[in-house]
Design a protein with these regions (language model features):
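Surface-exposed, charge/polar-rich loops and edge strands
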Residues: 1-415
Length: 415
C-alpha cells in the first residue's frame, strides 16, 4: 500500500508554461543553463548560479539564497501561481510518436523509509545534502521525481476519460522536439478514487530522481523530529512525483567509452575478447546491439558485435544477468582493469539519446580509445531488482523523455 494525495500545484499560467518549464537541474551544466534561460525560465530557480557574473559556485550560500529570492519573485510576478484546491494532474509526454501518461501527485516520505517506494540505485550523501538544502530553503519540491507503478486498468481508464473529454491546460513542444501536455483533474470523486486505487498498489518504483527522493525523505524526518505536534498529515510529509504505468515506459541504452586499452594493442584486445565472446567484424556501418548479452564495440574505425558465450553470466542472478554487469566483469574489469565505475577516470558514460554517432565521434577524435554500446535494460528487470532489494550498477538506466521542471511544483505552504 502507498499513501498519495492530490496537492495545490504552484505552476505557470497557460500563456507562460512553455517558457517557465525547463530541463531538469542535473542534465545540463551551468554554462548551458545560462545560455538556455529566458526571462521566466525555471532555470533561474533550479540553477540560480547563472544569475551571477561570473557564474557562481552552485553550492555557495549566496546561490542557495538566490534560489529562494527567485522563487518568491516568480510568484509575485505571476509567472507561478498556486491552484486554489488540491488536484491530481495528468502529465503526458510524447517522443517520436510514443506518448506516456503520468499522474502528478504527492507521495509520503514514510513509504520510502518503509520500502513501499523502492529504489534501484545508491545515492551519494553530498548530492542528497545539496537537494535537502534546496527543499528546506524553498519549503517546496520545485522539481518532481519520476516514479513507475504496476499497470492498472482502472487508472488507465480514468486517465483516458479525462484526456478524451477535456482540453489540456498546457500543450507545448520543447526545443528538443518532445511534446508536453497537462490536464487538471478537478472532479473530487475522481481524485478520491485515484487515492483509493493507489492505496491498494503494493509499491512504487523510483525510475529517475533517487537523490531528490532520498532528500525529501530526510527533510520529512527532520520536520517530524522538530514538530512535537506531528500527525503525519502535514504537507512536509509529502513530496512531488510524476508516476507512470510501468508498461508505458522505455529505458534506453546507457553506453561506455574508455580512454585506453590497458596497454593492449587493438589486435590483442580482440583476441582477449574472443575468450568470453563471439566476435564479429561489422565493418564501418554503425552496429546496434540486437538482444540481451549482445554488445557493440567501436574500435579503430570499425564496429564489432560481441555476444557473450553461454556460461559467462548467471541467468538466475538479477544483477549478474544485466548486460552492464556482464560488460564490467568480462571486459572492463577482467581485460581493461577498470575496477570502480564510480571513481575511475579512464571511463565515461554516454546516454543513448545521443546516438551511436556520439560514441564514434569521441573515439575518432582521439579523446577515447574504444566505445561499447549495450542493449537497454527492461522495466521488468528494474522492477525485479528493486523487489529483491538489490542495487543496479552505476549508470545502468537512462529514461527519455525527461520530465520538464516547472510544469507543477509542490509547496509546503498550506495557506
Amino acid at each position: 500500500m502507498v499513501r498519495i494525495k492530490p496537492f495545490r500545484a504552484v505552476r505557470p499560467p497557460k500563456e507562460h508554461a512553455s517558457e517557465v518549464a525547463s530541463r531538469p537541474y542535473d542534465v545540463l551544466n551551468s554554462a548551458e543553463a545560462k545560455s538556455e534561460a529566458t526571462e521566466r525560465s525555471l532555470l533561474h530557480i533550479i540553477k540560480p548560479e547563472i544569475d551571477f557574473e561570473p557564474i557562481a559556485d552552485e553550492h555557495s550560500q549566496p546561490v542557495y539564497d538566490k534560489a529562494v529570492e527567485n522563487f518568491r519573485r516568480w510568484q509575485s510576478e505571476g509567472w507561478l501561481r498556486q491552484d486554489p484546491e488540491e488536484y491530481y494532474y495528468i502529465y503526458a509526454q510524447t517522443m517520436e510518436g510514443r506518448t506516456q501518461y503520468g499522474l502528478a501527485m504527492c507521495c509520503h516520505f514514510e513509504d520510502y523509509l518503509s520500502g513501499a517506494i523502492k529504489k534501484h540505485e545508491l545515492t551519494r550523501p553530498d548530492k542528497e545534502e545539496d537537494r535537502m538544502i534546496h527543499v528546506r530553503n524553498q519549503q517546496a519540491n520545485i522539481e518532481p521525481v519520476f516514479f513507475a507503478y504496476p499497470d492498472n486498468a482502472e487508472i488507465d481508464a480514468i486517465v483516458a476519460d479525462v484526456v478524451k473529454n477535456n482540453a489540456p491546460e498546457y500543450d507545448f513542444t520543447a526545443a528538443d522536439g518532445f511534446g508536453h501536455r497537462l490536464w487538471v483533474i478537478r472532479d473530487r470523486k475522481t481524485n478520491d478514487r485515484i487515492t483509493e486505487i493507489f492505496a491498494g498498489i503494493p509499491a512504487l518504483y523510483v525510475a529517475d530522481g533517487h537523490h531528490r527522493t532520498a532528500a525529501a525523505a530526510r527533510v520529512g524526518q527532520e520536520c517530524r523530529a522538530n514538530n512535537p505536534d506531528h500527525t503525519g498529515c502535514e504537507e512536509y510529509c509529502y513530496f512531488l512525483a510524476v508516476t507512470f504505468p510501468a508498461g508505458q515506459l522505455r529505458i534506453i541504452d546507457y553506453n561506455r567509452v574508455v580512454k585506453d586499452l590497458n596497454g593492449l594493442t587493438p589486435a590483442e584486445l580482440l583476441e582477449k575478447l574472443k575468450e568470453s565472446f563471439t566476435v564479429e567484424d561489422k565493418g564501418t556501418e554503425e552496429y546496434r546491439p540486437a538482444a540481451l548479452h549482445n554488445f557493440s564495440m567501436y574500435l579503430e574505425g570499425r564496429w564489432y558485435s560481441l555476444t557473450a558465450k553461454p556460461g559467462m553470466y548467471d541467468d538466475n542472478d538479477p544483477i549478474g544477468v544485466l548486460d552492464v554487469t556482464v560488460l564490467s566483469n568480462l571486459v572492463l574489469d577482467k581485460i581493461l582493469d577498470i575496477k570502480d565505475l564510480r571513481t575511475s577516470k579512464r571511463i565515461d558514460f554516454v546516454g543513448g539519446i545521443r546516438g551511436l554517432g556520439e560514441l564514434k565521434r569521441r573515439v575518432d577524435s582521439g579523446e577515447m580509445k574504444a566505445a561499447f554500446a549495450l542493449y537497454p535494460v527492461s522495466m521488468q528487470q528494474l522492477i525485479n531488482i528493486a523487489d529483491t532489494g538489490n542495487i543496479m550498477p552505476p549508470k545502468t538506466t537512462w529514461f527519455e523523455p525527461k520530465l520538464r521542471s516547472g510544469v507543477v511544483i509542490h509547496s509546503f505552504d498550506e495557506k
